[in-house]
């Protein structure tokens, strides 16, 4: 009976040890998350405790940039606000050239 109890305790310890967090995984410090207002230089960051002050000041204080996606084919200078729009554009007949017609002449 004593052996069975010892075995159960060892098994319980083994299960607990494998289920317990080891700290080896990706850990992120919440305080390291930062928000950059327009007035702050690129090398400076603000911690989350100062974030509430920025939010109270309004979202206009935060720097927001539009992302543009440019056509990657040839000399086309088309710009799009979404990746899906760029992909649709690249698949259009504008960029699907027929086999070179100049070879048949």
Curated annotation (Swiss-Prot):
The gene is HTR7. Its main location: secreted. Keywords: Host nucleus, Metal-binding, Secreted, Signal, Transcription, Transcription regulation, Virulence, Zinc, Zinc-finger. GO terms for cellular component: extracellular region; host cell nucleus. One of its GO terms (molecular function) is zinc ion binding. It is found in: Secreted; Host nucleus. This is Host transcription reprogramming factor 7. It comes from the Eukaryota. The lineage of its organism: Eukaryota, Fungi, Dikarya, Ascomycota, Pezizomycotina. Induction: Expressed during multiple stages of host plant infection, including the prepenetration, late biotrophy, transition and necrotrophy. PROSITE patterns: ZINC_FINGER_C2H2_1 (PS00028). Probable secreted effector that translocates into the nuclei of host cells to reprogram the expression of targeted genes by binding on effector binding elements in rice.
């Amino acid at each position: 009976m004593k052996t069975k109890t010892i075995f159960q305790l060892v098994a319980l310890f083994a299960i607990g040890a494998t289920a317990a967090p080891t700290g080896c995984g990706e850990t992120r410090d919440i305080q390291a998350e930062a928000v950059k207002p327009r007035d702050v230089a690129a090398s400076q960051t603000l911690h989350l405790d100062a974030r509430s002050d920025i939010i109270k000041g309004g979202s206009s204080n935060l720097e927001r940039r539009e992302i543009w996606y440019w056509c990657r084919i040839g000399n086309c200078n088309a710009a799009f606000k979404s990746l899906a729009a760029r992909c649709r554009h690249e698949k259009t007949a504008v960029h699907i050239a027929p086999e070179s017609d100049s070879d048949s002449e």
